[in-house]
Each structure stands twice: as C-alpha cells, then as structure tokens.
Amino acid sequence: MNPNQKIICISATGMTLSVVSLLIGIANLGLNIGLHYKVGDTPDANTPNVNETNSTTTIINNNTQNNFTNITNIIVSKNEERTFLNLTKPLCEVNSWHILSKDNAIRIGEDAHILVTREPYLSCDPQGCRMFALSQGTTLRGRHANGTIHDRSPFRALISWEMGQAPSPYNVRVECIGWSSTSCHDGISRMSICMSGPNNNASAVVWYGGRPVTEIPSWAGNILRTQESECVCHRGICPVVMTDGPANNRAATKIIYFKEGKIQKIEELAGNAQHIEECSCYGAVGMIKCICRDNWKGANRPVITIDSEMMTHTSKYLCSKVLTDTSRPNDPTNGDCDAPITGGSPDPGVKGFAFLDGENSWLGRTISKDSRSGYEMLKVPNAETDTRSEPTSHQVIINNQNWSGYSGAFIDYWANKECFNPCFYVELIRGRPKESSVLWTSNSIVALCGSRERLGSWSWHDGAEIIYFK
C-alpha cells in the first residue's frame, strides 16, 4: 500500500469512529430526555410531598437516584399571615411576680466585651421578646467609657438583643440612632423612634419595618424626648408621648398617633397632669394607660389614658396615697387625683410604672424615698381612683442595700393566654455617680412577670463587684 492509500485509510477510519461517537452521544441524550419526562410523568413516585406550614419556610431534602436523575433541595415558602395587634383581653390576675430574665451585664463585662448602656427596656413581638437599651458606643473596659455618665452624645444608639443575653458588639441589632427612644410592634412590623441632635434643636426619626419613614423637628427647642420604654399599638395605631421643654417647669407634651410609622394625629396634652416625662405604657381591653414622671412638682405619678381608636386621651394623677416617685415625702393620709403632691429631695424624679386594674392594681417604687436604691412591688387595690387606697400585698424585688434605677412596663401581647400578663423590668445602675472609682455609668437588667401563685421574695440585684474593675 503506497503512502497516499495509507493516508486515505486512516482518514476513513477516523471519520467512521467520529460518526459512531456522535451517534452514541445522540442516543445518550435522547435516553436521558426520555427518562427525565418519564420521571416527571410519575409524581407519586419521585416528587416529594411538601408540607406547607404557617411559619416562614419549609426545606425538604429528597435525594432520589433513578437513571442518574437527582432531585434535591426543594424549597417552598409560605408567608405567615400577620394582622394588627388587637388589645381585646383584660390584664391577668396577679398575686406575685416571678423571674423572667436577668442579663448580668456588669458581672459579665468585667471579663468580656459588654456595651455601656442605660435607659433599658423590654419589648415583644410575635416571635418573642427582646431587650433594648441606649448604647454609649463603647464597652465597659474601653477607654471611651470615661464620661458615659452624660445622657446625650452623637455616639448613642437604640440597640436590641436576645432576651437574657448581655449586650455586646457581636449580638446586638441597631434599631435607630439617638439618645432617647421608644419602640413597639403593631403585629405586622416594628416601629422605633430615636431622638438625636443638640439640646436646642433635637429631632426624632421614626423607623418602621427597618426603614426611616417620618422625621419630627423640635417644637420647643429644649431637649425633645420620649418614653424610654415600649409604646403600645392597637389595631395599627401606635400612640407615643413626647415632651419638649423644661424639666423643672411647664413643658410642651404631645401625644402623637402613628400608623406604620406615619403621623395620623397630634394632640396637645389635655387634663390635669402638669408635667410629663418618660411614660411607661401598657394596653388592655381596648385602652392604653401610660404612667409617667412629673419631674417638676409631683411625687405622685401622672396617668394618661389613651383611646387609640378615637385618637383621644385624658390625664390625671394616680389617686392613691402610696407615692411612687423618687425622691418623695412620706406617704400622706390622702392622695390626690387632680394635682401633684410635692415634697422630697434631692432628686426630682425617676422613670416608673404601675398596672391599674381595680382590685388587681400594682405599683412599683424604690424602697428608699431619697435615692434610687432597692425596689418593691405593692398591691394597692383601686389605686387609680381611691385617694385612701393602701397596700394589701408586698414583694421585694431589689433589697435596699443595692442600687436600682429606671423601671417600666411591658407585656407579651402574643402569648397564648386568655389575658395579658403584666411584666416589668428594673434598671440596675452601676458606676458613676454613686460608684466613682470607675469611669463609666452603665446598667444590667432584671425582668419579672405576674403570677397567680403567691411566690416568695428574693433580691435580684446586679451583683457585680466594682473593685474587680479597678
């Protein structure tokens, strides 16, 4: 065979093999397509059963090997249907208070990166409850902790974190930026409000669903401020109490009604209350009650009752002779529903709360009349309306050898109960001004909820040894 014949023979053989390979490839492709449609035509055999739920996402792994066909990771999403919170239930009967949470932030912060905070509170949503506070933008052991006794700075922010944990840079969520705040969930999404800026020209930014929606300028040029605990929503309307003006004279207080972060109505304070700050609010049977701080005159607390559906309110003073602000004079013979009861020194007031429910009424106050130390709960039937009402039950929360601070109300409105169970928190302030051996001012938190049982008292104080921070 000559060279040309060899070349022709080799070329023919190569072409034949190429054609055979092509035919095999086409046959393989056809076979796979046929098998694929065969699998698709038999859903009972190879399609996973998908269970739809009322929660967020169901992920089902069903690995089926059949003629090289692999089905895996089928994801079916079904949005949970949410509705606006409806405050139709009454308050639960309370005979004592059980522990809910204690974060031990100062104790943990002796040896961990824990944020400096103050003005803490708790607030719940359909998924559970979270702790909130105004961070100072530094940690207890950080050098910037020097000077955190001051309330207002550009470095503060409203943060939230899982209930029971201590706040660190690694577990908190920033809700908004500012040095005064409130936050609440309407059943569909969360509204958070932060005040920031200079004393003479502060402003509020209202966030809803994680986005800024509304801005509010100062109306009196004197430290625009708000509740420092949760607001409450009813059928989508979320009233918030804000004050602008002097802390020791008549100020301009407004009740602003929001829906989805947008202003629906603004009311000037009406009624007998003469000074309003730092209201602690809760809702039941369609109404919202806010128990506030009269920083100008009253050792008895102002009460604002809000009808959020009508978007109207009234104000008065807690009638009981059991005084609950700090500092305060001795309890008088009679209370006053319409005017402040003066007296007490040296501090003009502290944030506090009460649950006012006829015979089922409870008041919280520091044990000391003169300083923010100790904390007790007093059952005072008809405290809202009876000027001679007095305690019938008593429970120590913090003994008087330990510091307390602000306190406020909250309720898990989504708990599966026939009634709304009252809960409260106490801020446990440590550091300056009382403990000047450290440079910082911060707090831990303890929270308790109502019980129908009659439980014993115990002191839930902060427990950190300041000497360890030196």
Curated annotation (Swiss-Prot):
Keyword Metal-binding: yes
Enzyme Commission number, as recorded: 3.2.1.18
GO molecular function (one): metal ion binding
Virion surface side: 28-470
UniProt modification remark: N-glycosylated.
Disulfides per UniProt: C92-C419, C124-C129, C184-C231, C233-C238, C279-C292, C281-C290, C319-C337, C423-C449
Catalytic activity, as annotated: Hydrolysis of alpha-(2->3)-, alpha-(2->6)-, alpha-(2->8)- glycosidic linkages of terminal sialic acid residues in oligosaccharides, glycoproteins, glycolipids, colominic acid and synthetic substrates
Principal place of residence: virion
Coiled-coil stretches noted in the UniProt entry, renumbered to this chain: none
Stretch list, region Head of neuraminidase: 91-470
GO terms classed as biological process: carbohydrate metabolic process; viral budding from plasma membrane
UniProt-annotated binding residues for substrate: R118, R152, E277, E278, R293, R372
Regulation: Inhibited by the neuraminidase inhibitors zanamivir (Relenza) and oseltamivir (Tamiflu). These drugs interfere with the release of progeny virus from infected cells and are effective against all influenza strains. Resistance to neuraminidase inhibitors is quite rare.
Renumbered residue ranges of the record's region Involved in apical transport and lipid raft association: 11-33
Residues at the active site: D151 (proton donor/acceptor), Y406 (nucleophile)
UniProt-listed HAMAP family: INFV_NRAM
Task of the protein: Catalyzes the removal of terminal sialic acid residues from viral and cellular glycoconjugates. Cleaves off the terminal sialic acids on the glycosylated HA during virus budding to facilitate virus release. Additionally helps virus spread through the circulation by further removing sialic acids from the cell surface. These cleavages prevent self-aggregation and ensure the efficient spread of the progeny virus from cell to cell. Otherwise, infection would be limited to one round of replication.
Similarity-based family: Belongs to the glycosyl hydrolase 34 family.
Protein name: Neuraminidase
Name of the encoding gene: NA
